[in-house]
């Protein structure tokens, strides 16, 4: 798809659904999977928030933070992948609240027993279920979407089976209002579907920045 056409295509994909929950992103949280779908890191890079519909949601993410070492040295701490499920039915904003992670001891404690909170717009805790996503694949590059599907089928603490069944059919990417309620034309590739999906979730500023970037790309 040529870049100009891509920008026009995405602009026409602005949500007709009324989203009611804003998920505020943290620069110390690397979001990997949202509601069973791999996150488009290129589209969301630098985004401050994404918009969600009211209802149950599930995030798979890692905490990434620079910690101090003895001798005034530092290193980047990366947590194991975590799964958190929650419901935004009556919530308009979701914010991450991470525990103190400043040194190796605190990082080790977090690895063994991760804990964090999600807060609403009034800084009140949101009920959550938190778990570690145990990776079964031995591949060098982990497919977190597949690992999340497996997790959701296993009746674990933070499993949401409805997101496991979605994995079988990518036509659910645009679930409620979807142009994909009917069979998509052959020209509409899975890449386009995913790009449209994440574009619709991004906040307005991120959409604007992405469209500016897309317009500057040479035609393919």
From Swiss-Prot:
Disulfide bonds: none annotated. Pfam families: DUF2057 (PF09829). InterPro entries: UPF0319. Coiled coil: none annotated. Keywords: Signal. Residues 1-20 form the signal peptide. It comes from the Bacteria. The keyword 4Fe-4S does not apply. Belongs to the UPF0319 family. This is UPF0319 protein YccT.
């Amino acid at each position: 798809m040529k870049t100009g056409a891509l920008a026009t295509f995405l602009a026409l994909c602005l949500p007709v659904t009324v989203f009611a929950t804003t998920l505020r992103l943290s620069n110390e949280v690397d979001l990997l999977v949202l509601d069973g779908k791999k996150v488009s890191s290129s589209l969301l890079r630098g985004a401050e928030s994404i918009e969600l519909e009211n209802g149950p949601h599930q995030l798979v993410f890692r905490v990434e933070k620079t910690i101090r070492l003895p001798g005034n040295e530092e290193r980047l701490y990366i947590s194991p992948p975590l799964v958190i499920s929650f419901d935004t039915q009556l919530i308009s904003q979701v914010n991450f609240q991470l525990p103190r992670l400043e040194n190796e001891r605190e990082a080790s404690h977090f690895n063994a027993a991760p804990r964090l909170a999600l807060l609403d717009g009034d800084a009140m805790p949101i009920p959550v279920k938190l778990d570690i996503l145990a990776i079964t694949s031995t591949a060098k590059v982990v497919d977190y979407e597949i690992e999340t599907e497996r997790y959701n089928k296993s009746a674990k603490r933070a499993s949401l089976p409805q997101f496991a069944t979605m994995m079988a059919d990518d036509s659910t990417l645009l679930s409620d209002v979807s142009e994909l309620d009917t069979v998509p034309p052959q020209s509409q590739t899975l890449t386009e579907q995913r790009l449209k999906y994440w574009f619709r979730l991004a906040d307005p500023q991120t959409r604007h920045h992405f469209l500016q970037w897309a317009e500057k790309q040479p035609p393919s």
